[in-house]
């Protein structure tokens, strides 16, 4: 199931490269919503991979308003106290600036050339 959130980056995206050279970027998005006079904030941890990760790291910064679409997964890990805890992560399939609040200059990503198999 696809999920879309709209909010602001709470930190600059952190890019890393895993063993096979694949790019990975992690960032957090704060989503504000109002119910009557009350305002609520929800925070979402987001992960993007590959060329999307590189584009996010090169283009977006803390405070930017973004639209993120992806799927939710649950990560389980052992905390410092030795307890297994769960964390929900939005694995991004698409990320972009919210053009209602910003302008963007789009540059197509360069595609890798594939050599013929013969």
Region spans (language model):
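Beta-rich strand-turn-strand
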Residues: 49-85, 98-101
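A short glycine-rich, His/Asp/Glu-containing loop-to-beta-strand
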Residues: 2-4, 23-31, 42
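Short aromatic-glycine-enriched beta-strand elements
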Residues: 17-30, 86-88
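Short, basic/aromatic beta-hairpin or loop at an interaction surface
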Residues: 38-46
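A short hydrophobic beta-strand segment most commonly corresponding to one strand
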Residues: 87-95
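Acidic, gly/ser/pro-rich intrinsically disordered tails
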Residues: 1, 14-20, 36-39, 54, ...
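OB-fold and OB-like beta-barrel modules that bind single-stranded nucleic acids
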Residues: 4-11, 29, 62-73, 92
């Amino acid at each position: 199931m696809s999920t879309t959130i709209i909010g602001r980056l709470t930190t600059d995206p952190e890019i890393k490269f895993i063993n096979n050279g694949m790019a990975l970027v992690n960032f957090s998005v704060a989503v504000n919503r109002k119910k009557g006079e009350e305002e609520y904030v929800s925070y979402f941890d987001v992960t993007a991979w590959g060329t999307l990760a590189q584009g996010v790291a090169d283009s977006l910064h803390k405070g930017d308003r973004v639209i993120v679409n992806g799927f939710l997964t649950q990560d389980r890990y052992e905390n410092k106290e030795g307890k297994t805890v769960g964390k929900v992560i939005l694995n991004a399939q698409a990320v972009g600036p919210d053009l209602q609040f910003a302008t963007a200059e789009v540059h197509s990503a360069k595609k890798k050339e594939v050599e013929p198999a013969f």
